[in-house]
From Swiss-Prot:
InterPro entries: CofD, CofD-like_dom_sf, FbiA/CofD. This is 2-phospho-L-lactate transferase. Belongs to the CofD family. Its cofactor is Mg(2+).
Length: 296
């Protein structure tokens, strides 16, 4: 099974899915950013940390028990990184960045990082090229990290686009596996900033039309479970609801998993408890989805 993932929602699910199914992951890289000379791939790192079970499961980013000595020391020296980067997390960024500077691809660097953390599943970036999710606000354009991390999602959003997406290509390693894959699960990540960038790489969306595709809605009622998904969906003209999520994936989606609160809101949907507060919740949801694929 192929799983499409961003940095929130889906990593929780993957902790459960690894107990019940074999899978590989293609991860959004449109939120990647260079900080202090190192390439940060927040969504890839969250996926790896979650599967390795070292993720800070209170914030759902970074590493559990991390310290921030380097970040704080830089601040004392008069340099503000903008993002609060943990010391252990920074080691991941350094490993990746040194490999990239040595001429390795992002796919190769991601494989090395995953293996270093003991992750057996294959994790791939959506592309090798630099793509940046850009949020058009009432205060001007800003990188998604600036909008969400520095500004806490406060500015009014007018539009969202992916700078550089026209040059992005599906990695050969992903093309080969995708050609053979029959089942695709779109995790409960932000449809606009986590999943849409992946679907916008070359002809990725078209390649899903002959697959069995199930998506899990990150919207319950009219609210996002976490993050700014609602605000961003409205900006792109989608209804903030499970139906709006289905509309984003309309041309290839076979079935949408919605929360029990949204039971019966639309055809081609099935309801269960989609809120994952514990690993047991994640295992239960993963088992539910795996059985759905068997019935498609």
């Amino acid at each position: 099974m192929l799983v499409l993932s961003g940095g929130t929602g889906t990593p929780k699910l993957l902790q459960g899915l690894k107990e019940v199914a074999d899978f590989w992951v293609v991860v959004n890289t449109a939120e990647d950013v260079w900080v202090s000379g190192n390439k940060i791939c927040p969504d890839i790192d969250s996926v790896i940390y979650a599967i390795a079970e070292v993720i800070d499961d209170e914030k759902w980013w970074g590493i559990k028990g991390d310290t921030f000595h380097t970040h704080e020391r830089l601040k004392e020296l008069g340099f503000d990184e903008g993002m609060r980067i943990g010391d252990l997390d920074r080691a991941t960024h350094i490993l990746r960045s040194e490999m990239l500077r040595a001429g390795k691809s992002l796919c190769e660097a991601t494989k090395a990082v995953a293996e270093a953390y003991g992750v057996k599943q294959e994790i791939f970036p959506m592309c090798e090229e630099e793509v940046s999710t850009t949020v058009v606000t009432d205060e001007g354009e800003m990188h998604f990290q600036e909008f969400w991390v520095l500004r806490r999602g406060e500015p009014e959003v007018k539009d969202v686009y992916f700078r550089g997406i026209e040059k992005a290509r599906i990695p050969d390693e992903v093309k080969e596996r995708l050609r053979k894959e029959k089942e695709v699960l779109i995790g409960p990540s932000n449809p606009i900033t986590s999943i849409l960038p992946i679907l916008s790489v070359e002809d990725f969306r078209e390649r899903l039309r002959d697959k069995k595709v199930i998506a899990i809605s990150p919207i319950v009622g009219e609210k996002a479970v976490s993050g700014p998904a609602g605000k961003l969906m409205r900006a792109k003209g989608y209804e903030v609801s499970a139906r709006g999520v289905a509309d984003v994936y309309a041309d290839f989606l076979d079935l949408l998993v919605v929360d029990e609160a949204d039971k019966g809101v639309m055809e081609r949907s099935v309801a269960t408890n989609t809120i994952m507060k514990t690993k047991e919740d994640a295992v239960r949801l993963a088992e539910f989805v795996v059985k759905l694929f068997d019935g498609l």
